[in-house]
């Protein structure tokens, strides 16, 4: 597994996705967020995070409404609620190239297996967040 990720897509731009994706973007990583409801706000106002670990503002964030707008990336971070996993077969393929890894930061059981059915078990990273 190659841990050198040059591009990242965050699928699920709620609290978890915006926090961890925002931290990666703050560190200088190329992060793109797949967004539904807050697209216009993020596009217009950027991202503001208030955290016990330090507040930060990203005046500009890369947001997209469809995975096709993002295109293939090195790392996909899935942070949406597991109840949306039925959409994975539509959402993941446009984000993949031959070396893409998929990290899941979701509650519940069976998430890695659902993702593995699409990308192969060798390309799945199961994660936890605090």
Please provide the spans of the model-predicted regions:
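Rossmann-like NAD(P)(H) cofactor-binding subdomain of soluble oxidoreductases
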Residues: 57-130
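NAD(P)+-binding Rossmann beta1-loop-alpha1 motif at the extreme N-terminus of oxidoreductases
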Residues: 1-51
